[in-house]
Amino acid sequence: MNRALISITVLLLVIATFPAASIGSSDNNPPSQPIPLNYFGMHIHLTVTANGMDPLRPWPSVPIPELRLWDAGVAWPNIEPRKGAWNFSELDVYLNLAEEHKTNVLLTIGLSPGWASARPAEPSISRPGLAAEPRDLEDWRTYVATVATHCKGRVEGYEIWNEPNLKAYWSGDVDKLILLTREASEIIRRVDPQAIIVSPSATGSYGTKWLAEFLSKGGGQYVDVIGYHFYVNPEPPEAMVPIIQDVRQIMNDHGAGGKPLWNTELGWSKPKPFPSDELAGAYLARAYILNWVTGVERLYWYAWDNHGWISIETTEADNRTLKPAGKAYGILQQWLVGSRIVGCSADADHTWTCELNRRGTPRWIVWNVDRTEPFVPPVSWHARRVTPLLEEGRNTTTNIFISPIPELFE
């Protein structure tokens, strides 16, 4: 996870300087295909125990098409706590639940257990040694091969390490992680040729330098997808736009422009305050919209059942009752899946307009970043109905007020 603060100054300067800042121009085209259901990813990491599903933490009541397993008790130290002593009990519960709910799984591999770590006493994210590379490359090969064999046909893809630009997660150099990526890729492709290989996912605006070095040294040739964590906490989702554009430019500069870009982890953390749960839900919705239109083809939200570190919670403390963010996750699937986003633009007043097209029928999503104000939809839209994100729709387009909470016009 990333707790750093990232400034939105550049984005606001662009919007303030020009009458309209647009996304979807020739150099930043949204994906041309309709938005698929599997664009919507999620983290679930408190739902299961080694003995099965925790009855106090039920599976989400909204569709979860894609699941990233991280902070879920299934990293290398959990799977092989001692050399040769394998424990797949908790991972198997996740895989069984995923199969039951027709959910694809992305498994993030890595973190060196103490017995395998090159620097077992070195401080890391939770206990010493985790961030170091393995002392013996053969231990890494055995771990990857064993996991890939165990999970063959049950895991859609493997992500090689988490947030390597943060010393708490990775203390080795880029060359060492390229080596681990190469070895893991070769093994996984041999064991499970259908599996998707995702690059190590750097995080934040300061992670672009790490990604550029990884790609410039040839790391991209070993992966199918470029992963990144576009955290902008505590700033609003619009702050992601220039960072995503920077990452896409880096990919183009280093021969990886043709690979998909996935945002494999995103959320907002405490102490970021939200004046209302409705605004928190709006952040989730705007993040999914803007990631897609800037070229991200999958986004994994962090996290469904975390009530401690995150500030945008999807459920109440009972882990059943949906909060506005949980509702927004499901509603947004209904709004977006099957639609093509033509583009988004922001005017000088920070009002964003995104044009959608579903099977030839145009629709528009509108919000203002920082205030509530009257809005008159253009006559050319021929809009007859407006649906606020968290409310019932109504057959009128008069007396409309837009706010930071998106509204759908159709």
Each model region followed by its residue ranges:
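Bacterial N-terminal signal peptides
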Residues: 8-17
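Substrate-binding cleft and catalytic face of glycoside hydrolase catalytic domains
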Residues: 62-223, 229-233
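Aromatic/acidic polysaccharide-binding cleft in carbohydrate-active enzymes
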Residues: 268-332, 343-349
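Conserved, mostly hydrophobic/aromatic
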Residues: 98, 147, 158, 163, ...
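C-terminal beta-strand-rich structural cap/linker in extracellular carbohydrate-active enzymes
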Residues: 393-410
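Noncatalytic carbohydrate-binding groove/subsite architecture in carbohydrate-active enzymes
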Residues: 51-53, 174-288, 294
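Boundary/entry segment of secreted carbohydrate-active catalytic domains
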Residues: 27-73
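Carbohydrate-binding surface patches
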Residues: 346-382
